């Protein structure tokens, strides 16, 4: 792996904000967990980091409440809101995650580790508990790969007048992010997709998608129900990153681009 990850990747975003002259405050996961909706309520808009994968119920609930009360979120990361996460009361610096019986994981929970000691909740994926990430930001984890990133390409919804502002300065056929520090493009490393069956709001506009990922990007294991070939990007249309936009009640909105590489492809 020859590119930054997590905090070093997020520093690219902070540099870009400063370089572009945008004023922004930094809110940590600890802040959001301790203060809930009150932490986000004063914000005109909120932007995630590049890999917001570990969230307890409290921070997910605060994010949903913010969107439902005229909040505006830019989810520009990948593999977000993925793993059930617990914290010990009085010890916010310590989190607990149990990687249970599905999901992309580098270790497997042992017998007796199916429930978090810190909260008593069942561990594993939020997806398996009926709270797939698509229910919050419209996108959810679909693939990961480490070879090459690709640009996003326009989809038919990109020509809708409601999203013209997203493509200001781009031609109708211009690729979106055919450059970047994370494997050469804006779409890669970890990809999230639009999926109505998992909770993407039905009025969501699917404005752009990645294509041409290699077969080193397989479909995530939690969605593979049979052991047969054809689960790589060149054969499975679910293996892609999507860029979407949807509105919420009281004039809220979410613009989401499902890619960990995205924050390292800002001009």
Descriptions of predicted regions:
Residues 6-12, 49-50, 54, 72, ...:
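Intrinsic-disorder/low-complexity accessory segments
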Residues 19-25, 41-45, 68-73, 202-203, ...:
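Loop/turn elements at helix/coil->beta-strand transitions in domains of secreted/extracellular proteins
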Residues 1-39:
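Aromatic-Pro/Gly-enriched surface loop or interdomain linker
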């Amino acid at each position: 792996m020859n590119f930054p990850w997590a905090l070093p990747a997020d520093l690219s975003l902070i540099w870009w904000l400063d370089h572009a002259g945008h004023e922004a405050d930094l809110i940590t996961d600890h802040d959001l967990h301790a203060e809930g909706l009150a932490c986000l309520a004063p914000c005109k808009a909120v932007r995630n980091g590049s890999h917001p994968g570990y969230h307890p119920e409290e921070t997910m609930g605060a994010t949903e409440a913010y969107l439902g009360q005229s909040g505006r979120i830019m989810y520009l990361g990948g593999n977000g809101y993925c793993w059930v996460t617990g914290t010990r009361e009085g010890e916010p610096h310590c989190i607990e995650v149990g990687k249970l019986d599905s999901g992309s994981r580098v270790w497997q929970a042992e017998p007796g580790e199916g429930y978090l000691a810190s909260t008593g909740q069942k561990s594993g994926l939020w997806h398996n508990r009926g709270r797939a990430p698509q229910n919050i930001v419209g996108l959810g984890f679909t693939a990961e790969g480490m070879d090459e990133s690709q640009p996003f390409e326009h989809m038919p919804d990109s020509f809708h007048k409601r999203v013209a502002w997203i493509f200001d300065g781009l031609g109708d056929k211009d690729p979106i992010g055919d450059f970047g520090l994370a494997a050469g493009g804006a779409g890669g490393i970890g990809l999230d997709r639009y999926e109505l069956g998992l909770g993407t709001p039905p009025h969501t506009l699917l404005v752009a998608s990645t294509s041409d990922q290699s077969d080193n990007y397989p479909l995530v294991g939690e969605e593979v129900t049979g052991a047969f070939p054809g689960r790589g990007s060149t054969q499975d249309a679910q293996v892609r990153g999507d860029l979407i936009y949807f509105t919420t009640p009281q004039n809220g909105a979410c613009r989401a681009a499902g890619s960990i590489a995205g924050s390292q492809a800002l001009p």
